[in-house]
């Protein structure tokens, strides 16, 4: 994890939620004069500091942090939006002679940073709104069947219950008349493509990780997660927006609506987060590409000098 010749260099820290990524990033930033850059698709949102485990003000005061809480919850912040924002931040950090430390659990963000992103035309808001209205009340499996009739190749790549991605594919079809796969051969290069990067993936003991996830959710409830979700609920945003689907949000909204008890909402949030952590590890194992070092969090902290 050296910093000699920092221009173009970066440290990337990934791993499942609650694995200690932020603590490692902060330790490295303090030791090496680095800038912590967010790579978590939920921590970009201003509405959810507690429930997304964003660094708190005391932590942010110890080192520069970028792209945390910078997006309003009403925005559907895509990978393309992230790539544009993070590219600008990386250039600023390098220009100042700093070391970017990119940390988070969103695999697609890291993949885009390193490999680039397909050039998909923007979908007009009128098209998106009309399609979402048409899809409201329909089962995701039925929407997937519609997609399969019009774009068999694209549908085969998506799960029959992955509503957001199925809708995205249908939107592109509606807006362009061409399947999503037609655009996936043309790629915008990633800002870290070919750059010298130290890539670390934290892998805690599974039983310990499950216990940490459950304990952290309880701590979030004590720290104001329910109030945070109540404020978000009061905004009456589209329930399909990413911020409304953050782990813990649907269950806590159901509690506020009287559909779940507090205990049921907490159990749902814990279970959803545990399942997400498992998916994160699986995704990185099969999709992240070469060059990642898999380390126990304790070993990574020792290496960082923390």
From Swiss-Prot:
Enzyme nomenclature, EC number: 2.5.1.75
GO molecular function: ATP binding; tRNA dimethylallyltransferase activity
Domain of life (superkingdom): Bacteria
Region entry Interaction with substrate tRNA, spans: 40-43
Binding-site residues for ATP, renumbered to this chain: 15-22
Site (Interaction with substrate tRNA): 106, 128
Catalytic activity: adenosine(37) in tRNA + dimethylallyl diphosphate = N(6)-dimethylallyladenosine(37) in tRNA + diphosphate
Keywords: ATP-binding, Magnesium, Nucleotide-binding, Transferase, tRNA processing
GO annotation (BP), single: tRNA modification
Family note: Belongs to the IPP transferase family.
Subunit relationships: Monomer.
Protein purpose: Catalyzes the transfer of a dimethylallyl group onto the adenine at position 37 in tRNAs that read codons beginning with uridine, leading to the formation of N6-(dimethylallyl)adenosine (i(6)A).
Full protein name: tRNA dimethylallyltransferase
The organism of origin for this protein: Methylobacterium sp. (strain 4-46)
Classification lineage: Bacteria, Pseudomonadati, Pseudomonadota, Alphaproteobacteria, Hyphomicrobiales
Gene: miaA
